Swiss-Prot record:
Belongs to the WD repeat DSE1 family. Involved in cell wall metabolism and required for the separation of the mother and daughter cells. The keyword Cell division applies. Residues 1-144, 677-707 are annotated as: Disordered. One of its GO terms (molecular function) is histone binding. One of its GO terms (biological process) is regulation of DNA-templated transcription. It comes from Yarrowia lipolytica (strain CLIB 122 / E 150) (Yeast). This is Protein DSE1. SMART domains: WD40. Residues 691-703 have a biased composition (Basic and acidic residues). Residues 30-39, 48-68 have a biased composition (Polar residues). The gene is DSE1.
Length: 719
């Protein structure tokens, strides 16, 4: 009996122990992260079943009970919703399409089985034809969806905030206009006409726009996966004709090949850059044919950059070389991929001609006039490179540089855009002279947000277009700030005077013989060369933008057009914005208020030369040479004087008078009066004669006594 009781107690103890262990195991599994996720998935699956099944279904109770029992709940009183009739069970194809496309856009939720197109790659290794949709019957002229005119004063109104429709800034600008009347000369308002069309892009991600050089063709690129290249043609009555829609990988850069280039003989060729490290040369068929587009050449950047050096596979910037680049083949393609600069030859294989790593490079620009010269925006500075040299660069120090562009009509002007996303620093544009890198020529301020695009005008060398995230498109006029100057040029130079002297002697070759010799001898004595202004010169006034277009959305890309709309005498600017709209803007080029307009008039060319005493001057200059100045060509320099007295250091000075020169046959535009000829007293130079020189250098005391030649005037030729 005792043995039976002991066995029963042992059994009860083991049962209690097993129950205690089961509770501990249940507590551990219930509080673990994996169990919580499983419970959540069971609850979610339970709700899905209870929603999609009808309560009248006899198998409803069983299915619901199974789901709720797995969750540990009762089945009584469970409320269910009727199953929708249009419900479709999710298939494997839909799941792939959902994860392969962008889920934010409703058009991407459709599967390939519903649209009738299976998942396939647009490009294959042995398939060099892109898919284009061209239906001659569906080609029709598109009318603009909006047409408005923007009237702005100079300086322009402050940029508004577009968080909510608030136009109080217009009233404030009108109140400020009265204060500006005393400072700036008022001019009539400038009207900017804008037309816009909605591009049928499903992704709503327009990235680039390009305008043909000789024909009214516009190419618009999108970052979508299909149907992302649109080709349009502008008509005379401000209409737009849609010709083709082509499927390429996500496009981030477009450039039309110039008709003057060798490859362009095949037809309309478009250079494209994509987000997968590829660049193409695409041959577009005739606009009124149904032939597909053809890829002439493909450039793969991934094969030439190691994986560890690859920061981004997106190619945003590409450019084509000009005929001035004699070191490369005509129509060579330059691209920027993951801080590496590539130069491709379309006639060669898949190997680039040149590869150069540029640290922190975000954008670049090729010089259209100088062979091998490249400017790269590298964040904290702008780097000037010569691709013909193995290494070496010149840096222009200016922070937050994200864009740069060489002027297509001036070989020395370079524009850089500086933007700060954090808003701690200003957003501005700086104009540089590539020959003088000490500091910028001008600083253009006015944008309140990041600058997205930078484009020089194709008609005026002094006009610059910029667009920003603040919703403004601005036209800057720096004509009075960077005008044509008299030769020798009037620049502030702080470098080596000896090198500057050699440069002046070379620039003096265009003068007549006697005047050229006078200038070269004057340079030997003058402490400040002739083309250096006095330090106490007047401070340059800031350049103002002449017109602007205020939009509700930021412009993603800007391109200067080579055509003018009907009824407008101003060039056009083509833009694409973030909402999928294409805009054509006619922006007038007004004269800034802070300068006086130039009045062309015919002037008499006179000579004004500063003379210096020299022992060898009597032997070099004769009366015949001096009188020859009166018989020179009409291109006598207006900066030279009509009469000068040359005095030697001998007791019997030789005097000669040059008669007045003939009137010039060309017209000049002068904004300030000429200074009269300088009357310089007799000076005797002292000191040792330098080797290799035919004149004596004056002493330091006499050198300081020499006055500086003040040539502070504006001179330019007009047609």
């Amino acid at each position: 009996m005792d043995a039976l009781v002991n066995s029963f107690e042992d059994l009860n103890t083991s049962h209690t122990t097993s129950r205690y262990r089961a509770k501990r195991h249940h507590a551990r599994t219930k509080s673990s992260p994996g169990s919580i996720k499983r419970n959540q998935s069971i609850r979610r699956h339970s709700r899905t079943l209870s929603t999609h099944y009808d309560s009248s279904n006899p198998y409803q109770d069983a299915s619901t009970s199974y789901a709720q029992l797995s969750m540990g709940r009762r089945t009584e009183g469970s409320s269910t919703k009727p199953r929708p009739k249009s419900y479709v069970e999710p298939s494997h194809t839909q799941t792939q399409a959902h994860y392969a496309t962008d889920s934010h856009h409703p058009s991407h939720s459709r599967s390939h089985s519903q649209t009738g197109h299976g998942p396939r790659a647009t490009f294959r290794h042995h398939h060099h034809r892109s898919k284009s949709h061209t239906n001659p019957r569906s080609r029709f002229e598109l009318r603009p969806q909006s047409h408005h005119e923007t009237y702005t004063y100079l300086p322009d109104d402050p940029s508004p905030q577009f968080d909510e429709p608030n136009f109080s800034w217009m009233e404030e600008a009108e109140n400020q206009l009265s204060e500006l009347q005393s400072k700036y000369k008022p001019e009539p308002m400038a009207a900017s006409t804008s037309l816009s069309w909605q591009i049928p892009d499903e992704s709503h991600h327009l990235t680039s726009v390009a305008v043909h050089e000789s024909s009214p063709l516009i190419a618009v690129g999108s970052g979508g996966k299909e149907n992302n290249l649109f080709v349009y043609e502008t008509t005379q009555d401000k209409g737009l004709i849609h010709h083709q829609t082509i499927s390429l990988p996500a496009i981030h850069g477009l450039k039309w090949l110039s008709p003057s280039q060798q490859v362009a003989d095949l037809g309309n060729i478009l250079a494209t850059s994509h987000s997968n490290g590829l660049a193409h040369l695409v041959l577009l068929p005739d606009c009124y044919s149904s032939d597909p587009a053809e890829i002439l050449k493909r450039f793969n950047h991934k094969h030439h950059v190691s994986i560890k050096d690859t920061l981004s596979t997106r190619i945003k910037h590409l450019e084509l070389t000009t005929p001035a680049w004699r070191s490369s083949v005509s129509s060579s393609l330059a691209t920027l991929y993951s801080q590496h600069l590539f130069l491709w030859d379309p006639s060669r294989g898949d190997t680039p001609v040149l590869t150069r790593k540029v640290k922190r490079a975000e954008a670049f620009s090729l010089s259209p006039f100088q062979d091998g010269q490249v400017a790269a925006a590298c964040g904290k500075y702008t780097s000037l490179l010569d691709l013909r040299a193995k290494s070496g660069s010149v840096n222009l120090l200016a922070g937050n540089t994200n864009l740069c562009a060489y002027s297509p009509m001036n070989s020395n002007l370079l524009a850089t855009a500086h933007s700060d996303v954090s808003g701690l620093q200003e957003n501005c544009v700086r104009i540089w002279d590539s020959r003088h890198t000490a500091g910028p020529l001008h600083k253009l301020e006015g944008h309140t947000d990041q600058i997205r695009s930078l484009e020089w005008s194709k008609f005026n060398p002094c006009e610059l277009h910029t667009s920003s995230n603040d919703g403004s498109l601005r036209l800057w006029n720096i004509g009075r700030q960077q005008e044509t100057k008299a030769r020798p040029s009037l620049e502030v130079y702080s470098g080596d005077l000896a090198a500057q002297w050699d440069e002046q002697k070379a620039s003096a070759q265009w003068l007549p013989r006697s005047a050229r010799q006078m200038q070269q001898r004057g340079l030997a004595f003058n402490v400040a060369p002739l083309n250096i202004q006095k330090k106490e010169k007047k401070e340059k006034k800031p350049a103002l933008y002449s017109s602007s277009v205020i939009a509700k959305t930021p412009h993603a890309a800007v391109a200067s057009a080579s055509f003018m709309p009907t009824g407008s005498m101003h060039p056009s600017v083509v833009t694409v914005d973030s909402y999928g709209s294409l805009g054509i803007h006619s922006m007038p080029s007004a004269t800034p208020y802070n300068t006086e307009p130039e009045t062309p008039r015919t002037l008499t060319a006179r000579m004004s030369v500063q003379s210096f005493a020299s022992t060898d001057m009597s032997s070099d200059f004769t009366e015949a040479d001096m009188s020859s100045a009166s018989d020179t060509s009409p291109m006598t320099s207006p900066s030279m004087a009509s009469a000068a007295t040359f005095q030697s250091s001998y007791d019997s000075p030789v005097k000669a008078c040059i008669p007045e020169a003939r009137p010039a046959t060309y017209e000049t535009s002068v904004s300030s009066s000429f200074i009269p000829p300088l009357q310089i007293k007799k000076r005797v130079p002292s000191g040792p004669r330098p080797e290799g020189s035919h004149v004596r250098r004056p002493s330091r005391e006499s050198r300081n006594m020499l006055p500086e030649l003040d040539l502070d005037f504006d001179f330019g030729l007009t047609a």
